[in-house]
Design a protein with these regions (language model features):
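Membrane-embedded hairpin module used as a gating/binding unit in multi-pass transport
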Residues: 188-263
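Short glycine-rich or small-residue beta-strand-to-loop segments that form or flank ligand, phosphate
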Residues: 61-72, 95-99, 256-258
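C-terminal non-catalytic interaction/assembly regions of soluble proteins
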Residues: 3, 271-372
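N-terminal amphipathic/basic leader segments beginning at the initiator methionine
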Residues: 1-43
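An acidic, phosphate/nucleotide-engaging active-site surface
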Residues: 105-165
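Long, well-ordered mid-to-C-terminal structural blocks that present hydrophobic/aromatic surfaces
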Residues: 233-301
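Glycine-rich phosphate/diphosphate-binding loops that line cofactor/substrate pockets in enzymes
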Residues: 48-66, 85-90, 246-254, 281-283, ...
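Histidine-anchored nucleotide/phosphate-binding helix
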Residues: 71-92, 274-282, 288
Length: 372
């Protein structure tokens, strides 16, 4: 049977025996772009369990919009927000992104809105907000802490550190100074994906009641959910699972996993997430082929950086052999303990000799759950 694995920069197409294929995951459907602008405006005008966006603010409010630039249709969403706020009479609109976010290069800021980049290392930009129930003092960017209204906009996705990313995580840890503990590649699957209690608590302490979350499709924006914060979390968790939860009957001897997608650049964090997804689908002693377009700097940041505990890569490589397609030289890849492949077709050759096979497109956005 014919199979395809999508990743940033390309796709692998090959033929495999159907009796050896356990599952092939392609992700959700492509989003329909024809009515995208109307769907975005509808979400803002008829939100969940909350008045429309235009009734959330009053003229003269200082509005800050913590924003996740990795959200599909990011510039269109910002434009619709700016239009609605401008119609109400809001003149101070600031879009703020985390300076550590690498997906901001194509973000277009609408007229009437300014862009601020948050630098968590600059203590002069931070202000004390409150102390959490666990006793942690919360510091956020001063513009956020002092705003009259904070409307966070985030991409929904799985995040092993906090359960799920979304508008709540754009605020905390996105615009604060906190760092969360590194999570092992081999960590058990988190049972809860609605969002971490602490980022949710910080949103509440800040008074951010109206939040906006986007569900990405295989390409484009699949759904925009706006409204009362807890309602957005609940609806968002269900929508995320409906789009990106991959229920797998059994592990395979070979997993071929694509990192990134045809319309987006992959990041070091995406490599970690996709690697983790593939590990959950492969048998001990099996093989993983990761298809990427990343360079050596990004690969080293992902596998030797602070996002993984010390020695974690070695533990993962003891579970399965890992082949990597990338822009890095073969010697540099192999210095990390991985096996380099320089063409996607080499992953197909691995499939020809595997006893069982799973393929996962855009593995970095996928949550793999074993049913057995």
């Amino acid at each position: 049977m014919s199979l395809r694995v999508d990743y940033q920069g390309g796709q692998l197409e090959f033929v495999a025996d159907a009796d050896r294929l356990i599952a092939a995951w392609a992700g959700p459907a492509d989003a329909d772009a024809s009515d995208q602008a109307d769907r975005i405006r509808s979400a803002l005008e008829a939100p969940l369990d909350f008045p429309p966006l235009r009734q959330v603010v009053v003229p003269g409010d200082r509005v800050v919009i913590p924003f996740d630039p990795s959200l599909p249709a990011a510039s269109v969403i910002l434009g619709k927000i700016a239009t609605i706020l401008g119609e109400v009479g809001v003149e101070s609109m600031i879009a703020m992104i985390d300076g550590r976010e690498t997906a901001s290069r194509d973000l277009a800021i609408p007229t009437g809105m300014t862009l601020e980049i948050h630098d968590p290392s600059d203590r002069t930009t931070l202000a004390y907000l409150a102390t959490t129930e666990a006793g942690r003092r919360i510091y956020l960017n001063r513009l956020v802490a002092d705003a009259d209204c904070v409307i966070p906009v985030g991409r929904l996705g799985y995040d092993e550190r906090i359960g799920a990313r979304g508008p709540w995580s754009v605020i905390e840890p996105g615009l604060g100074d906190a760092t969360y503990p590194a999570v092992s590649l081999l960590a058990p699957l988190r049972a809860k994906v609605e969002g971490s209690e602490e980022p949710t608590e910080v949103s509440r302490l800040l008074g951010s009641q109206f939040q906006i979350a986007g569900v990405p499709g295989r390409s484009g924006l699949l759904e925009l959910i706006a409204g009362e914060a807890s309602s957005v979390q609940i609806r968002g968790a269900a929508a995320l699972d409906a789009a990106w939860l991959f229920n797998l009957d059994d592990r395979a001897d070979l997993v071929i996993a694509g990192i990134g997608g045809p319309d987006r650049l992959a990041t070091p964090a995406d490599l970690v997430a996709g690697f983790r997804t593939a590990l959950r689908a492969v048998n001990r002693g099996g093989k993983i082929a990761l298809l990427t377009d990343l360079d050596l700097v990004a690969i080293r940041e992902a596998l030797r950086g602070p996002t993984l505990p010390g020695g974690d890569l070695e533990k993962a490589l003891a579970w399965a052999d890992v082949y990597l397609l990338s822009k890095a030289a073969a010697d540099d890849v192999e210095d990390l303990g991985l096996l380099a492949i320089d063409r996607p077709s080499q992953a197909a050759k691995l499939a020809a000799s595997a006893h069982s096979l799973v393929t996962i497109s855009q593995a970095d956005r996928t949550r793999t759950a074993l049913l057995s």
